Amino acid sequence: DAIDDSNRVVIIASSTRDGEEEKVLTAFKRVLESHPNTVLLLVPRHPERFDAVATLVGRMGLRLGRRSKNDLLTEEMQVYLGDSMGEMMSYYRLASIAFVGGSLVNTGCQNVLEPAAFGIPVVTGPSQFNFATICRQLEAESALRTVANEKELADFLIDLIPDWARQAEMGRRGKALVEHNQDSLPALLSLLEPLLAEPSSDA
């Protein structure tokens, strides 16, 4: 795949909403100053916004590739737009760290269990009302970090990117919580049934 063969550090921003991408991109520009080998895999929640988000990326001075155009990830590319349907689980497989969208705007975050099930550290903004219980559990296990704004998001990513041991530990704790709660969280985990049934990518 376009990103699979890259040695870049991939941060996914999944299911982002209108008004949120600009905040994430602002944070990511700061991340690039410290970690220029990082790429942002940006996956907006609504397909009708793909083109508008692509325009925003260009307006913010970031170099863009698009899944819909089968662009290959080059060294110059800074943002890769996941403008396709039905590939979120494949995108999570490629990522080192996941920001879950809907959380830096007041719409409520999307499903934080998805990246946790892949053993990826999770970060969200403060709007978590629709997954409040599981967010609290993940945070108590040090598998999820809540940030208040784009500045805190940038600070967290800048610190976490070079800390491979912490990434692995956050990911391990999140995946363990998902597995431990399979019986006690049936409603939430029903969302993950297709994912949990998939073979491991390194099998």
Model-inferred region functions:
Residues 1-203:
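Nucleotide-activated sugar donor-binding and catalytic core shared by glycosyltransferases
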